[in-house]
Amino acid sequence: MAPARGRFLLTLHSHLPLVLGHGRWPHGSDWLCEVTAGCYLPLLEVFERLAADGRRDLATLTLSPVLCEQLAHPSYRPEVETFLEGRLRSARENRGQFEAAGEDALAALTRVWEAEYGRLLARFRALDGDVLGAFRRLAAAGVVELITSAATHGYLPLLGREESVDLQLRLGAASHARHFGAAPRGAWLPECGYRPRYEWSPPAGPLRGKVRRRRRGIEEHLARLGLRYFVTDAHLLRGGEPYSAYRDYYPALRTVAAGADQPAYQRDRTPYRPYLVASRGGEGAAAVFTRDPRTTLQVWSRELGYPGDGRYLEFHKKHAPGGIRYWRVT
């Protein structure tokens, strides 16, 4: 048998801010229901099918704490059922509208969506609305590994107090243990944000530049909680300019990121191996895995990746009324 050339670690991070209790559209529970129908239920189907074939250790998944609290909330199931039932009605109503307008191709697509939403509704009811429980069972069977994130997805390097960083991670780990029945071994840092131990001064306010104090490295907080690894971006490993999917299209972002155009120190480090992170003078260490830059472009770039590929649905164009997507990327 030929020696293994390497290992591939598929890591999927999922987060949604608190939307339950804030209406339905445009930034209320519809957002949570859409991602349930378009992501969580299909993902569960794939993992369960592979598990039935005896496959294990398929992926590492992060369901952020604030997302888990919503998936476990009593209002989640009725909201999703109402959403899917509404989409079924919309597909039927849209078909009549398209047929009356002579849009035969669009009318045919309504049948595809009617079948899909009907299947998803049946699948959701078969789970008794317990999406978290389905992921928990997969983790218990060794099909996937579940890790945690910061409690409210706060950007840890910019939090001004050590207590804030500690509580974000401590409550995130506690939420994970409560929902999944086991302590997490790793964490996805929000926006892959990391900083080492260093002398810190308030970046704004009356004390800006006037006081300095030693701040712990993020890895020290992780180690205190038994979190053994985290994920970061390639530019934090090697230096250089971070990739931005939006900066070239929004002048305000170019202004904010003007400093990134300056030459940056780069180190000869490969993102295709793990590293142990420890700050000089710190207490505790954690391993780090680095996101593959090419995969990042595939996911986020509209020039090189899925957002600009005509074989995929146009995310931002929906039919009104009803909210169903019938158009591809153009």
Question: What role is predicted for each listed range?
Answer:
Residues T62-L67, A150, G186-G193, H235-L236:
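Short, solvent-exposed turn/loop segments enriched in Gly/Ser/Thr/Pro and often Arg
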